[in-house]
């Protein structure tokens, strides 16, 4: 697996912006500065991990190197909490549907399903006993 450290991943162009070495990434991590880690398998981008001061975004890429799942975590008291999950559906490389799941630590759950072709939005809310 190849690891690339950079300032940001440019999703539309499928390329890193401002590549740097592991030491710079480590220094950014320790100082709370944003950076991105790109993981490639067989010359294809498989995962993009965006590190921010209190947030981590893990993007799973499909065979076209397009983001199809994102998990968003929030860091609080040295613990990560999954606060959102995004599922993207595509036809060819055109995004046609987005599902968003939002989570709160008190057990509240929010779901939104967006049909990006018709503009229709379906929403649901629930509370889960935690």
What is the predicted function of each stretch?
Residues 1-130:
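Buried hydrophobic residues that stabilize the cores of well-folded domains
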């Amino acid at each position: 697996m190849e690891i690339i450290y950079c300032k940001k991943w440019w999703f539309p162009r499928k390329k890193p912006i401002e590549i740097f070495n592991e030491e710079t990434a480590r220094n950014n991590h320790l100082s709370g500065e944003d950076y991105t880690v790109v993981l490639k398998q067989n010359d294809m981008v498989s995962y993009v991990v965006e590190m921010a001061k209190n947030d981590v975004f893990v993007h799973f890429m499909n065979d076209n190197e397009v983001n199809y799942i994102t998990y968003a975590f929030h860091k609080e008291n040295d613990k990560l909490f999954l606060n959102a999950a995004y599922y993207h559906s595509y036809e060819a490389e055109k995004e046609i549907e987005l599902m968003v799941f939002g989570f709160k630590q008190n057990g509240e759950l929010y779901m939104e399903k967006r049909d990006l072709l018709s503009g229709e939005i379906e929403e649901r809310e629930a509370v889960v006993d935690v």
